[in-house]
UniProtKB/Swiss-Prot annotation:
Keywords: 4Fe-4S, Iron, Iron-sulfur, Membrane, Metal-binding, NAD, NADP, Plastoquinone, Quinone, Thylakoid, Translocase, Transport. It is a peripheral membrane protein. Transmembrane segments: none annotated. NCBIfam families: nuoB_fam (TIGR01957), PRK06411.1 (NF005012). This is NAD(P)H-quinone oxidoreductase subunit K. The keyword ATP-binding does not apply. Binds 1 [4Fe-4S] cluster. The lineage of its organism: Bacteria, Bacillati, Cyanobacteriota, Cyanophyceae, Synechococcales. It comes from Prochlorococcus marinus (strain AS9601).
Length: 244
């Protein structure tokens, strides 16, 4: 009678004949090399270190943000790459006073940015109008009246360290978002600002004054008579100037 082989011996014989290198073995280290996550977390993780800001500086607050570009603070380590086109940016940093004439341009830039997009209101003049909110008729009292703001950064002006803190808090918000929240740009919480007390004034440039011919025509009695020079006067003056 042939001796019976154990299952372990049979497995070793098969491994030696079928696969000389041996069968793959699952080790305990494999569980440490697999990350289980959702599509939201993967998408948010990829965007955390790739926020491309569009710099919209209108006043002195932007000088503090310009200090971040230097080697002392080095904002490149956060993945911030300034863009000059709103179609390539996903973060709008508004730094400085926003006037009534610049408001349409700001809204147009925000609308040209692709989704998802975020806004940081930097400085007191951007958030509430600052010192211009009391009696100025040209300053916007809060940029959140024009576009939705995700993060308020108060200060006059804020320090570069405060800007870093704002970017870190914005990254936390981005990391906790879901797919359904990316399309919602409505702002739920707004900064307390004073409303504009202005009256609607129609434009005076209607063109009606051009149709009033009586206002443009000078009466004949008030017209001054033009004194005509003799014909030989100009010729004699030219001849005398040439001879001299």
């Amino acid at each position: 009678m042939k001796p019976q082989l154990s299952p372990k011996a049979i497995r070793e014989i098969r491994e030696g004949t079928c696969n000389p290198l041996g069968a793959p073995q699952v080790t305990t280290d494999l569980s440490e090399n697999i990350i289980l996550t959702s599509l939201d977390d993967l998408h948010n993780w990829a965007r955390l270190s790739s926020l491309w800001p569009l710099l919209y500086g209108t006043a002195c607050c932007f000088i503090e943000f310009a200090a971040l570009i230097g080697s002392r603070f080095d904002f490149d380590r956060f993945g911030l790459v300034p863009r000059s086109s709103p179609r390539q940016a996903d973060l709008l940093i508004v730094a400085g006073t926003v006037t009534m004439k610049m408001a349409p341009a700001l809204v147009r830039l925000y609308e040209q940015m692709p989704e998802p997009k975020y806004v940081i209101a930097m400085g007191a003049c951007t958030i509430t109008g600052g010192m211009f909110s009391a009696d100025s008729t040209t300053a916007v009292r809060g940029v959140d009246k024009l576009i939705p703001v995700d993060l308020y950064l108060p200060g006059c002006p804020p320090r570069p360290e405060a800007i870093f803190d704002a970017v870190i808090k914005l990254r936390k918000k981005v990391g906790n978002e879901s797919i359904l929240e990316r399309t919602k740009t409505e702002q739920t919480h707004r900064y307390i600002t004073s409303d504009h007390e202005m009256n609607l004034v129609f434009s005076e440039n209607t063109g009606e004054y051009l149709n009033k011919t009586s206002a443009n025509v000078i009466p004949p009695s008030k017209k001054e008579k033009i004194t005509e020079l003799p014909e030989n006067t100009e010729k004699t003056e030219i001849i005398n100037s040439v001879e001299d």
